[in-house]
Design a protein with these regions (language model features):
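Short coil/linker segments at helix-helix boundaries
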Residues: 17-50, 59, 70-129, 136-178, ...
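Flexible, glycine-rich surface segments
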Residues: 218-228, 232-237, 241, 245-255
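Compositionally biased, proline/threonine/alanine/serine-rich low-complexity intrinsically disordered stretches
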Residues: 10-22, 279-280
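Bacterial N-terminal signal peptides
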Residues: 1-12
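TPR alpha-solenoid repeat register
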Residues: 63, 133, 182, 233-234, ...
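A cross-kingdom marker for long, charged
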Residues: 240-280
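Short solvent-exposed coil/turn linkers within tandem alpha-helical repeat scaffolds
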Residues: 56-60, 127, 175-176, 228-229, ...
Length: 280
């Protein structure tokens, strides 16, 4: 995870088609429910759901990794980081005021990541190709990258975690290409770094970074279409990408679907209203 097409089948009224029905988050497990609550900005409820899953499945590192994600998302929301104009204007984002993170939230975030990493490392020591453990490690690295970049504004340090997440994602996808959530890590690296000026991209390639913007979009699209826990997040990133490319129709379709699926998250509806007002 790190921030940054038409998906009519995802945003059209009516039930999801069979190929996508399994991808959509349900409330059938505490883990699924927690992600739904997190995307709906119901953070306390999400923490309770993730805690329940962690108690039921202490050997699953996705539980504490998901809990860490809820701490990060709640902090981004509290600090007002999730504002479209900042993401669409690189200079404005870089020049934004220095943020004041909550120490207690940071401590809880770090503890959740430490639990996830400890459990994942134990699983991988016994089974090096365990998909859930690898996915949890990818999420852990992505969350650390997001915190460094979006809250602390330590972009170079963030890039190191992004690169490590991309390498692990490639490893997981080589083992099992059906882990569609993992495509997001590779897609983010390509897309975000692909936006840099050509000399910067050349330098980043020397250090092993992937900087193909179009390939990044393709990877994000795979998660947005077929992912599970990270599917809504990938759709959000694609909406941001569409707005950057002045493709308002595409952004509107993605946002409409997200607004229907997560009505408590006013971020989607607010930007959708702005787009509709701009057309009048």
């Amino acid at each position: 995870m790190a921030l940054l097409f038409l998906f009519p089948v995802l945003v059209a009224p009516g039930p999801a088609p069979p190929s996508l029905a399994r991808a959509i988050l349900s409330s059938s497990t505490p883990l699924d429910l927690g992600f739904r609550q997190m995307y709906n900005l119901q953070f306390e409820e999400a923490h309770r759901s993730f805690s329940e899953w962690e108690q039921l499945h202490p050997d699953d590192p996705l539980g504490p990794a998901s809990d860490a994600a809820a701490y990060l998302f709640s902090e981004l929301e509290r600090l007002g980081v999730l504002r479209w104009k900042l993401f669409l204007d690189d200079e404005k984002f870089k020049q934004a005021r220095r943020l004041a993170p909550d120490p207690a939230t940071r401590q809880a975030f770090d503890k959740a990541l430490a639990r996830s990493e400890q459990v994942a490392d134990g699983v991988l020591a016994r089974s090096p190709q365990d998909g859930n453990a690898l996915l949890a490690k990818i999420m852990d690295l992505g969350l650390r990258s997001d915190y460094l970049a979006l809250i602390e504004k330590r972009y170079l340090a963030s890039l190191g975690y992004t690169k490590r997440a991309g390498i692990l994602a490639e490893k997981l996808l080589a083992i099992d290409p059906s882990y569609y959530d993992a495509y997001l890590a590779v897609g983010i690296e390509n897309y975000i770094l692909g936006l840099k000026p050509a000399p910067v991209r050349w330098l980043l390639r020397i250090y092993g970074a992937q900087t193909d913007k179009d390939q990044g979009i393709d990877r994000l699209r795979l998660t947005a279409e077929k992912g599970h826990y990270l599917r809504p997040f990938a759709q959000l990133l694609l909406a941001v990408a569409a707005l950057r490319d002045k493709d308002q129709n595409q952004a509107r379709e993605l946002l409409a679907g997200l607004a229907r699926e997560f009505p408590n998250n006013t971020l989607y509806q607010r930007e959708l209203d702005r787009l509709q007002s701009a057309q009048k």
